[in-house]
Amino acid sequence: MAEECNKLLEFPSVVDRYFKRWYKSDVKGKPCEDHCILQHSNRICIITLAECHPLLQNGKTIKTISYQISANCSRLQNKVSGKSKRGAQFLTEHAPLCRISSTDGEEYTIYSCIRGRLLEVNENILQNPELLKEKPSTEGYIAVVLPKFEESKTVTEGLLSQQEYEEILLSRAAVGSGTVSAV
């Protein structure tokens, strides 16, 4: 009985309990630049970096994060109001959300990966970029996007489920170790 009380119970995290993970691998043809989309049952999607993104690997240090996409477009200028989210910027699958540079000179562009309205960007990562590395699925998210109601069921077409993504990671590891097996 005492052993049962002392036994640690494994509960799923809040993210795993309320969100379904979807992945986009090799975004824009760039190897290993994977994004994760957390989809809630209420349609809201949170864009994050996938665990295997190069920024989260190899001890990289983040130098700057910029939501300034072009001279006329800053994601920080997104002002949303009202029930129908008036004023929200509309995003396509290939719309850039932010640019992140590391101290080794690499620059990564993070894309929306889904169509919808930009509800908010995470301004906390501007002051504390390490949140991206320390808590990529929670406090280190990139942006919150709301797909159109009529597209909410099809928004994940072209994205990978967690199981499909894990299979891709295994195949990358096999290629990296030189032990590719015939399918």
UniProtKB/Swiss-Prot annotation:
GO cellular component: dendrite; filopodium tip; growth cone; lamellipodium; nuclear speck
Main subcellular location of this protein, as a coarse class: nucleus
Subcellular localization: Nucleus speckle; Cell projection, Lamellipodium; Nucleus; Cell projection, Growth cone
Pfam entry (one): GCV_H
Source organism superkingdom: Eukaryota
Keyword Nucleus: yes
GO BP annotations, alphabetical order: dendrite morphogenesis; regulation of actin filament polymerization; regulation of filopodium assembly
Alphabetically ordered keywords of this record: Cell projection, Nucleus
The protein's role, per its UniProt record: May regulate actin polymerization, filopodia dynamics and arborization of neurons.
Similarity comment: family membership: Belongs to the ABITRAM family.
Name the UniProt record assigns to this protein: Protein Abitram
